[in-house]
């Protein structure tokens, strides 16, 4: 397949060297690529970490670390309060990567080779409980960073110990040099079948993921800024470009005849939005459930487009799209709202109602609701800085679990917002309030300018619980894990992983097509290629809290590790006799675990995986070998089999007090690492409780010994504040909620724990006082058991205990509630404790509290001799202890009784040589204990049945409500979709029927008016022309025959044959000529006349009237159009003339008024100067001028001053309704008192309400300024006048455009100083200031 030279994206691009573009990956486990990839990707997808084969040296260290921290199903994760559907593990997929498939198809010319995958490297891994195979994590295990607190900061330049930023597994799709502009928007869109991305010229390339078919959609003339599919299984693509063109394409495939199948794009909507200039990133967003509704942002406007109403009845064209101006919207387009700056992002969600969020460079985020013109809420999430992203994220488990994620400038600051209601649930309301719950701030410590260090694109994958940020400046992808929690307010970002890519990412999109697969496919538009990266969800999840010591973290918590050699010393084994971990046939349970046991803290990061754990050096200086698996240990040491416990999905997943070492569990990955969601059934809860025995034995030698051996224990290792499982389960059974897990011990449980601790404190004194007797008892018990068996086989003992413990395990969590009374499970690790150790110090072991003794400390104090009196004393104290423990409420008493029963049985078996009198008290005590045990069991069963029924019914109701909501929502969405589809089909059918009917009418009219008359006339002429000769030929033989026969009969008798023959000949000839002539003459006269009359009547009755009516209608339309056009033209011309004359008249009036005011001013000044001169003259000539002021001089002065009263002139002008001249005269005097008097003489409000205004804009502006200058006097009246005047001013008037702004600012400043005016004046001042502020904004 050769492509044309002009095609920038050929159908079959030649192979290119990946080494020149993409960085080689050092990952020892490349991604699965199927049969189509080259050898560089032909690696194994599924590899079992726990098979019998020896691992290779390359990944040996990695497997060792995984074996130490693989029990991820025991980690205390947050449980969900709603049901979670189970995950069905899928079989391994041969080719899960569509990008690989496309690359192979393109390189092979579109032909898909049916090649069987190679299986020589694949090994089927068997998972406990039927789990399927999983993807092997990359050899570069990324160690992310936990995000803690409401404000988390991540420095991209700081690398903590062990942090790795691996390069993602890449699959090239095509080589293409994209436009390297860093802009917002999605330049690529992907669904299950197609990949679409924009080219430089505005075209859109479409690729079929499965068949590698390609197509090019043309229509946009500039760069495509955003595109999106309606859904992953609906082939509706919406795109928008810089020129404001909006297209909706319906993608389909088909073939004509024997031709190859082709991808076609039918244009559903072609629209161009006009009225916005200099748009940088128009955006597009589909409605959540309605595929006919589309939301588009163009510049500052947000538009809602109904594709069923836009251009109804028209055929759209990509070359000439339908134009829609923002000032005059067409049918089907409406404005949702507007920002003060350009809109940067759109997102929608639906719960109870549909919400649309829009972000803008003006720093605001607005949330809109259907059929409301005002936003529900306006947020300024980033202190007024531009907002680049706003995304609604909905939990995949609950449709009402909705949060809002916003991104600041460069998407460097990410915030989570939830509704301010109870627990953050969204409820329908006219107004809403949102609050920020967490902030993630990305920073660079080496680059002070953020623009040079960051340009992030953001997408949210709600199904996978991930927030992905692609930094084009650093060639990196930051994966932020979202922990949804049980409510929106508990949703938080808890983990961040960083990955590197080969080149800058300009735009990207992510998909999770198969939720059962633990992968996210990220499709990227990069500077030199279109590529697909595979992101393993296993690498993005936060590691469990219990394994926090083995991961990189900035936390100060260190991980405890129980060492095997802590128990070897008590059994007499030397360190060199320690058996290999791989040789242990069964897992063992350590009983002697206490807070004083030796703990080992490993350094953070994966570097610890390649370093042998440090040896533990006891006080004598001899090093001991650690119990952790080393690099050279066998594979079986990392994965030892363990009993499978089926989980009960709704009950608490806590273990009932039994401690299991890490080696006792297989590496069972939780479902969420297989691509699903974390549910309440995915995890156990292992609560490490205090070893009461170790805590209560406050012996100085024990403490000193433990301090010397455990120097790495941090304060966080003290878990004394955590309640024990037995204390927790003394109360009736109930479902554990996250709040109970976080809040710890409730009030009732706290009181029980306090009481139990008080009893244990009472036991300390007895233990300290009789330590000697206890030591003797320990020795005798050990000797008794040794003498019975002769020798001790540690392997056999371990196996017996382990198998016995497995038989006693209940297979549901509900049974764990009564484990203290139903199990006696004390298997012991090889050499970890002396057999019979459960009777040490006379205190029975309680399974819930894990009471036991450190065998090292006890054995160090054992004496060389003993006596039987110590055993008697011990037995008596054991009975006291039984009495005390039996007084405790609930399950603690039952647990103690079970332990005492076991102790009594051991004493009986060890004292077979004693007399029967010694056994009688023990038998009585045993009988009493058995009775108490039976009663406790019955009571516990009753409590369990009562406690379990209530929560189950409650959860059933919750499940019923949730299912009802889900069904209602699904039914509503389906009904809406069906109704929309029905309406769409009805409209299409109606349109088709209407077009068909119109076409039939047109054809019928054309045939009747044009062709029918001509055909009829032509046919009639032709037929009548041939009728005459035909009729003559038919009639003549009949007449001849008749006449001849008649003549023959009449003349046969008298006339001879000769006369008859002559007469016949003459008659025939004459008759023939006569008949022919008559017939011809008859048809030429009567026939022609009849035909002409028929044609004439037809024309007069049908054709001519219809033609006249058509002509009349046509001429009437032409006449009306002409008259309307002439009228419009005349009115426009008249308006133009009137406007010109009005401006001239206005100018003349202003000139006259100004001249009159100047004249009046000159008269006033002349009179004033004349009066002054007269006064000076009179004073200089006659000193008695003051006495004669009432004489002729006084009259002269009065005569000069008499015309100076302006109110008379103003009153005359008002009476003549010359308001413009009166106000101009008053304002020219610059006397505010005269202006105030004039305002009081007229009804200013009514005057300003006239249309047109009698006062010009210049007079109004001057009046506002002068009234404001004297606002301190008569404030209330002047504020009222100013209010009327300011509402009548039009700042866009060209007459005052130059002077409006400075005068408005002056008035605003004057009013600003009078904001403290009394009473009602304050509201008037604020109102005028608000109006002036609006006018100032419009003057820009």
Curated annotation (Swiss-Prot):
Modified residues (Phosphoserine): 91, 648, 680
Primary location group: cytoplasm
Residue ranges of every copy of the LEM domain listed in the record: 1182-1226
SMART domains per the UniProt record, alphabetical: WD40 (SM00320)
Gene Ontology cellular component terms for the protein in this record: P-body
Domain of life: Eukaryota
Coiled coil: 755-784, 926-946, 1148-1168
Record-level Gene Ontology MF annotations: protein homodimerization activity
Subcellular location: Cytoplasm, P-body
Function noted in UniProt: As a component of the decapping complex, may play a role in the degradation of mRNAs.
Complex and partners: Homodimer. Component of the decapping complex.
Family of the protein in this entry: Belongs to the WD repeat EDC4 family.
The protein's name: Varicose-related protein
Species: Arabidopsis thaliana
Name of the gene encoding the protein in the UniProt record: VCR
